[in-house]
Regions:
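Active-site hotspot residues in diverse enzymes, especially metal/ion-binding acidic/histidine motifs
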Residues: 1-116
Length: 116
């Protein structure tokens, strides 16, 4: 997926829902956001997206500062929007910087574009 495609996906979502806050956007889209204590170790899971039986869920590590939770939520929202058919994504700090993972790179670009 090209950068232009990702920008267009963000623009389309914001226009459709009239929302630029990822927490409210998830609510508008019917995506359930859950909070779970997943630890503070450097390799702790930061968040993940899961779609099961048409129920979309993003789980965020509640041990993280709110500003980081917002970034993680935008990243996972990117997976929900861009990678619907893939099912489950676990977001580790290492994965965020893994440029060999195209889906992680796309979700990072989505989050960056969404939050600016």
């Amino acid at each position: 997926m090209s950068y232009a495609d990702i920008c267009e996906a963000v623009k389309r979502l914001k226009k459709k829902y009239g929302e630029s806050d990822p927490f409210r956007l998830c609510r508008e889209m019917g995506i359930v956001v859950l909070y779970q204590s997943l630890g503070t170790a450097p390799d702790a899971i930061k968040g993940f997206y899961l779609e099961c039986k048409r129920v979309k869920t993003i789980t965020i590590n509640s041990d993280l500062p709110l500003v980081i939770q917002k970034i993680i939520l935008a990243h996972e929202l990117g997976h929900a929007e861009l990678h619907r058919s893939e099912g489950l994504y676990a977001f580790h700090e290492v994965a965020m910087f893994d440029e060999s993972s195209i889906m992680e790179k796309e979700a990072n670009l989505f989050a960056a574009e969404f939050l600016i």
